[in-house]
């Protein structure tokens, strides 16, 4: 299509917006169109066989497709070819013909405007020729410094007779910023445009001359073959031109002094690596990115306390003293810890201290708040070592432990090395907290690093990626903590020796509150024993009705709640003299009761059985209900139960069916439904064929799972199918097999404590638990409750069902 500047303009034409290119009339340019507005403008131009205007977006307006985000001038041209691409874009070949200016906005989606051509005001031919000569001369001079003007382009500029075209050629080659390119583009006065271009080219020449001069100055001072050194010296020279201070000898000298002071305490490879990095830093300019990274590295590594190792040896007496002073009860864990450190002390006394760490790593396992971290703190105090806690919960990135390579932005040492720096010791006590909650992701498996850290054969040469040298971790005492041992990978479990910390009994919580928590909280709140007292009954009420946990964290919080109110009352003078908190006035200091264990029913019922459950905050009484409805022998199970518990219910149903078939359970025939079309005499087995059972575990919002309710569900089913009451003051726990055997379960201590709180008088437990775990049950529980060992479901039903008269 030919555009005649004397015909058809101004006229309305569609507008394509270009984000990256600044086009000129003489160009044939491929454009890649993907957005809806540009594609619509393209279709409009093709269908109407009209020219099209391509305009650039303004700076920081890439992606804009409205008149506010674009310049009001561009190139008028035609579409030579259109090719759809597989990715949905359209490639067009655009031929620029002339410059155009938007006079008026006439539409959007697509953009359309009334466009007229830009009319050039030309000076006299003599002046134009003179300016063109100067411009060509300056362009030739500039081409000596950069590659903006290849020979073919220079030849075209020299041979072109059209001044406007020469200006466009030079402008397109200079790679101008959009604002500058636009100001040159819309300049209608040819003389002014030539002068602006000449000035710009002269500025570029001067800038390139200065750059070359700096290079020459540097080049004369250094070895031409040392490219890296050349670049750094060049940067120095530039900074010198800007007046920057490059002196840093004092800082480098400080690094060298620190390194020399630590030299005799560190390995040879560590010393060489740090010295190498100091020397490298001395050759860098202080403002370079690499210098900042290297300086950060030296700040880290020279803080590692190579020279500081705690001299205190293991002392069983000190360990025992601190454990007993800081912790009530926990006799078995304390005994095992004392044995562990007795071995260390014996090895040290006999001069084989280097073998001390060749034993298993201690891991304190138990519910939250039972004193796992506190035990580690007591050990650290006894050994006069610093305690470093490293939280592993949710850790997925292996670099968090091993350190980040220095090539990454924000790189730093791993948490182990950071812990040594924090402790200012090379042999602190390091607590690896919540080791059972370590994750894994595409960034690696932290478990593999932990295996190396905890292996006495490997951890004397642990390599942190950030440090880039080996560091000795063998002097560290590692102690792990976990809530659920089963979640720890097998290889890691093999490295550790587990010390179980179970839930505290109410009596233990009372003693802990009286001897530890209350004195500590009084001190923390600025109170004295003469200011406030909490009665025994009030403390017992707080433990039973205001907290439900395995440990004592919430108990500490409730005591703190009381003391804050006491402090307020003292300051507002609401109370004169000593404030006494009793069971009667406890509600004035704490809100309503939060927890309350439902007491056992006071009468025997059919289909209602007390089971026992273990939770993360202790034990609980789990009441299981069963009803029968005339039907076809199916069973429905509700209460948000897991798969294991559902399977236990099915097994229990099958076991009871067998007992009925074998006449070990007597079914009163009057309860068996009769049908009009019965053709055979009713049998006991008809009771489970003609009834549907519904088994329910209350508190349906709480998920429940596990096999330990097996005998409880079997008892409920047997009770409802034989119309026999279950003793109201009995509770039970145990897994049932298809042959009626009772298998052992876990969490017995917590379960029996919960039963004791609920007023249960008799507990049925598996024989193996009776023989193995009864020694761990608190004395007050065993004194108040009859505990019966059962081997089979027959034993369970014999003790649980009320004998019929």
Swiss-Prot record:
It catalyses: Hydrolysis of proteins in presence of ATP. Residues 603-803 form the Lon proteolytic domain. Keywords: ATP-binding, Cytoplasm, Hydrolase, Nucleotide-binding, Protease, Serine protease, Stress response. Residues 13-205 form the Lon N-terminal domain. The keyword Ion transport does not apply. GO terms for biological process: cellular response to heat; protein quality control for misfolded or incompletely synthesized proteins. It comes from the Bacteria. Its EC number is 3.4.21.53. It is an enzyme of class 3 (hydrolase). ATP binds at residues 366-373. Induction: By heat shock. GO terms for cellular component: cytoplasm. Its main location: cytoplasm. It is found in: Cytoplasm. The active site is at residues 708, 751. GO terms for molecular function: ATP binding; ATP hydrolysis activity; ATP-dependent peptidase activity; sequence-specific DNA binding; serine-type endopeptidase activity. ATP-dependent serine protease that mediates the selective degradation of mutant and abnormal proteins as well as certain short-lived regulatory proteins. Required for cellular homeostasis and for survival from DNA damage and developmental changes induced by stress. Degrades polypeptides processively to yield small peptide fragments that are 5 to 10 amino acids long. Binds to DNA in a double-stranded, site-specific manner. Homohexamer. Organized in a ring with a central cavity. NCBIfam families: lon. PANTHER family: LON PROTEASE, LON PROTEASE HOMOLOG, MITOCHONDRIAL. Belongs to the peptidase S16 family. This is Lon protease. It comes from Campylobacter concisus (strain 13826).
